[in-house]
């Protein structure tokens, strides 16, 4: 696999940083192509953070996980699509009507703003949830894997471009959907013993081998003594 392709597979999560810290980090790591902006950073900095990152020539996964009624979700997708982001996330559990409306609105918003339309991906089951929490806290009778499969199918049938799943479910989903259906996976750890706030985890190599399209990685890079080396080492590990 070419190095360029491996760099395209890593999305750096910068939510724990302010925009100044993020800029310094990205200047130290010129090979990073993708960044993830989540609720924490977007709430702190506002939409201006997108413009700043785009000026640094970064591709942006805006991970706000919209989950509401169809009209509200589609309106939100319309607005963020005008920012020129590359990927946006919505909760698949919002239902097929909301998903279809969100995808349509993202196309309309991008067209109005004359920017490329973003990929819209469905959140399946959060990787922070363990099997026990999923069944007790959420009162679910089926397994996490069964629910991920169901929500991935809902996303696919609604015309979304992919889904977010843990690396544990990536293998079975990749057997069901071709490579043009994105499987974006958090829960990636270079040190498999260090879970932090995730439960369903794998190493970068294991996740890519299972069929993940892109890996969301934060602390392993942002908290490394040498973030650029940490990023390049991860790229090398998935060759």
From Swiss-Prot:
Pathway recorded for this protein: Pyrimidine metabolism; UMP biosynthesis via de novo pathway; UMP from orotate: step 2/2
Binding site for substrate: 15, 36, 63-72, 127, 189, 198, 218-219
Annotated catalytic residues: 65
Functional description taken from the UniProt entry: Catalyzes the decarboxylation of orotidine 5'-monophosphate (OMP) to uridine 5'-monophosphate (UMP).
Catalytic activity: orotidine 5'-phosphate + H(+) = UMP + CO2
EC number from the UniProt entry: 4.1.1.23
Organism: Prochlorococcus marinus subsp. pastoris (strain CCMP1986 / NIES-2087 / MED4)
Enzyme type, top EC level: lyase
Similarity section: Belongs to the OMP decarboxylase family. Type 1 subfamily.
Keyword set, alphabetical order: Decarboxylase, Lyase, Pyrimidine biosynthesis
Subunit note: Homodimer.
The UniProt record lists the keyword Lyase: yes
GO BP terms, alphabetized: 'de novo' pyrimidine nucleobase biosynthetic process; 'de novo' UMP biosynthetic process
An example molecular function term from Gene Ontology annotations: orotidine-5'-phosphate decarboxylase activity
One CC-aspect GO term: cytosol
Keyword 4Fe-4S: no
Database matches in HAMAP family: OMPdecase_type1_B (MF_01200_B)
CDD domains, alphabetized: OMP_decarboxylase_like (cd04725)
Protein name, as recorded: Orotidine 5'-phosphate decarboxylase
